[in-house]
Amino acid sequence: MTHSVPNIGFVSLGCPKNLVDSERILTELRSDGYNIIPTYENADLVIVNTCGFIDSAVQESLEAIGEALEANGKVLVTGCLGAKEDRIREVHPKVLEITGPHSYEAVMEHVHKYVPKPAYNPYINVVPSQGVKLTPKHYAYLKISEGCDHKCTFCIIPSLRGDLDSRPITQILDEAKRLADSGVKELLVVSQDTSAYSLDQSKETQNKTVFWNGIPIKNNLITLCQMLGTLGVWVRLHYVYPYPHVDDLIPLMAAGKILPYLDIPLQHASPKILKAMKRPGSVERVLERIKNWREICPELTLRSTFIVGFPGETEEDFQLLLDFLKEAQLDRVGCFKFSPVDGATATDMPDQVPEEVKEERFQRFMQLQQEISAARLQQKIGKTWKVIVDEIDEEGIIGRSMADAPEIDGVVYVDNVGQSAVRIGDIIDVRITRADEYDLWGTC
């Protein structure tokens, strides 16, 4: 007897947090017996998981919805842009249903409505325990919370994803262990505000002892990182705001429990601009803490992101930012030109910076940081570093050191002269022989 299995097309846009949402939806679809396909034409329904963070992302999402409608006609929309249903309906009124971010149950209800769950499920015994993953098998994103309590004037995330909502620590650890047991070698911890984990919960909940694998633990970030560090995999922290308790993470890094890597979105170094952004932090205190962190953990890699051309930014403000870069000597830095976002307070602020000035400052910023990054990478030459293997081809190995997150940082190009049996996901020793502004070269 032939059984018909419905086909669902799927498009995932946006940041790693949205990717985790996509993985959750795909896991639910596969568990219910739906077949996931990479095309629109043969799909019984198409789901588009959108991004709505900045206007360019909104445009990309609207274009993806339009392509799906043109090629198929039966489209569900979810994700951050889904929180702005009127915006979507104005452009694409024929979309069947729209839900906001992390609305897994609503998405599945809509799928069942338009494409009923198949009576026969060919995947009932083959859905992996760790769920469907969109990343390579050797690394995975681990989302520890939803939403954000900050009210940064350039951002609309709280209006899209809501206030901070931390997952129970035992639930996170269960997922992390499943991933590690499935062969994942690197966990990338993500959220909108990783260092705020559990701060949305009552003191009673934070201090309450719970048990995981028979071990008594508390519900806080430090304990979470300590326990993740027992799983035998790389643990990399992203989106870590510089709260005071972040200092307590550095000894864990120095001891090798979690990777010596901090992704801290500092955004600017002018007190005036930071105040206008509604961003916390004393620049002098940040510099002092960076110095202390590096004394405790000399191998610490610091990544950050900054915005140039924020409304009201003068040449003096920008120079303060350049001065900060020179003193902080950050390893990895991303820079964005301020972009108006529909619904963000900063969009309507006075003293908007002309586009040509933004571009000029962006170029000066990047030139300086490239010099800093190149100098810091030069210090790695002659040393041996652990490298996780991402790709293998006839020219050699491409991997990442402990200082490199996937997609946003550099890579290590390796001449494989002594380890013919190297496989993707292996962690190997590489002696560094050359460096440029972003990448390293070496031999194993």
UniProtKB/Swiss-Prot annotation:
Gene3D superfamilies: Methylthiotransferase, N-terminal domain, Nucleic acid-binding proteins, tm_1862 like domain
PROSITE patterns the UniProt entry points to: MTTASE_N (PS51449), MTTASE_RADICAL (PS01278), RADICAL_SAM (PS51918), TRAM (PS50926)
Residues annotated as binding [4Fe-4S] cluster 2: 148, 152, 155
Organism: Actinobacillus succinogenes (strain ATCC 55618 / DSM 22257 / CCUG 43843 / 130Z)
GO biological processes: tRNA modification
Function: Catalyzes the methylthiolation of an aspartic acid residue of ribosomal protein uS12.
Protein name: Ribosomal protein uS12 methylthiotransferase RimO
Gene expressing this chain: rimO
A Pfam family recorded for this sequence: TRAM_2
Domain Radical SAM core: 134-375
Residue ranges of domain TRAM in the record: 378-444
